[in-house]
Amino acid sequence: MASPPPIVEYAVFFTILAVLVFVAGEYLAWVYREQANSDHRPPGYLSWFERLDEIFTPIENGLYRLSGINPRREMTWKGYLKAVLVFNVCIWVLLFVVLMFQDALPMNFVGVGGESWDLAFHTASSFTSNTNQQHYSGETLSVFTHTFGIGIAMFLTPATGLALMPAFARAFTNKEDPRLGNFYENVVRGLVRFLLPISLLIAIILMAEGSVQTILGGQLTANTFTMGIQNIRIGPHAGIEAIKMFGTNGGGINAANAATAFENPTPLSNLVLTLAMPIGTFSAIYAWGAWVGNRSHGVAIVAAFFVIYMALTGVAVVGETGTNAGMVVTGNGLHVDQTVGNMEGKETRFGPTASAIWGLSTTGTTNGGVNSMHNSWTALGAFSLLFAFATNNISNGVGTGLLNILMFVILTAFIGALMIGRRPQYLGKKLEWQEMRYVFVVILVLPILVLIPQAAAVVYQGAIDSMNNPGFRGFSEVLYEFFSASANNGSGFEGLGDGTLFFNLVNGVQVLLARYVPITAQLAIAGYLANKKVSPESKGSLDTDTPAFVGLLIGVIIIVSALVFLPALVFGPIGELLSGGI
């Protein structure tokens, strides 16, 4: 059966996404209503959300008693930050130990060995920071490691991000009150009410479509037509895949990730998984407006990032449904039919359009899971991926994405107020040098972490030897690797041999700094703002829910991203495109 025209696939995807973002956004706003110190109530036709308390509250209370959490103990921003760091250090230690000693742990059905110390450092750092960058093949981990190491981290790290959102909302809903809530309560609510139930629903859909789900076997033996006997690793694919995509994780059980039929078997499963990536991030933006008592402001921010997301996705679709210059053969060479577009590195059950939409969904969030090989994309398609990184992953990750987006929103409000000669403020809180210095720290983290290592890598012989492609594409491979780590994304241009000591250590440090430096600065901003009075809006205040504000926000994001990263992009995908490369 022929695939629908690209414009139809594109339109259907974004229409469904817009509807789901509204419903999930109202639901998420309800989940953290009290924790955000908000008066939000869902619309009447969604009031059934409130009846879910009868199911979730007993589970949460049981977890509080079991873990000794006192949900009523409020924390200042410093206490909140301490809890975040302690919680994540525990996740890192768990992962590091499991990875190093998986050969001595149970459920190691095919006898895989433990990882080297540098690879275990990178893997533990990557999965603790919700990056899930893999310098190993997924098949080299045991079922125990996938289930009780990687799988647990895939739930706890997005829960960490979710727990940051109501704390930051308190910065604007509090009136001279430094308390930001209880981190552990917010983690539990995010797990019980958001991540677990929706991931379970996605996993059921995947199993219905044919995705594998087992913890009892290590591999499947197949007698193939052309390769003889082939051993294929199997495990808890459906369960891991669900939270991998919905929790903006990305690391797969198989090396080919969601391009494999065990993880992503059908076009329907592909649509569900593609939608799962941005739903959590965009619903958080919508929920922000509900928490601060201005739904239209949340819709305005969603609209701004939807415009960027849709535009870059359109560029990717154009690039990948066009021809691959490297496949155009002159003379008597083998002719490659490219009527459907660039099929190199793509699955025939998805095609170039669905692969392009997935590609921008995975780089437009901190997901990083792939259903096609990004290093086989055209120069135009590769540019769209790298520019999505330059915007700090468009909508970014679950929880942390909202906070990173709000740094651009606050910067836009600050610039906009100065442009019209008004005192800078945002949602009734004055913006002063204490907050703005931390906003600039967050915005500068990405370029510092990307460009300095990039400059070192292109002159360091060990890094140069890892490049499998010359020229512009080789430069793009390294740039993509550092973008992926520093934006907490995790995907890769797999032509790069990144499983070396250099890349393990550099990327391992990058993912940690990219995660925890912004969190520290953002909680400090929340602490400063929570202590301030709320200034009533006046006629002279900057409106943050108008098309003009949306346009200004888009302009700030693109200008900041383009000015900082344009030279690097010129040496990579832009140079390749202009030189007639693939």
From Swiss-Prot:
Domain of life according to the entry: Archaea
Subunit structure, interactors included: The system is composed of three essential subunits: KdpA, KdpB and KdpC. The complex also contains KdpF, a small non-essential subunit.
Any GO molecular function: P-type potassium transmembrane transporter activity
Keywords: Cell membrane, Ion transport, Membrane, Plasmid, Potassium, Potassium transport, Transmembrane, Transmembrane helix, Transport
Organism lineage string: Archaea, Methanobacteriati, Methanobacteriota, Stenosarchaea group, Halobacteria
Membrane association type: Multi-pass membrane protein
Gene Ontology cellular component terms for the protein in this record: plasma membrane
First-listed, main subcellular location of the protein, grouped into a coarse class: membrane
Protein name, UniProt field: Potassium-transporting ATPase potassium-binding subunit
Organism listed in the record: Halobacterium salinarum (strain ATCC 29341 / DSM 671 / R1)
Induction trigger: Up-regulated in response to K(+) limitation. Induced under desiccating conditions.
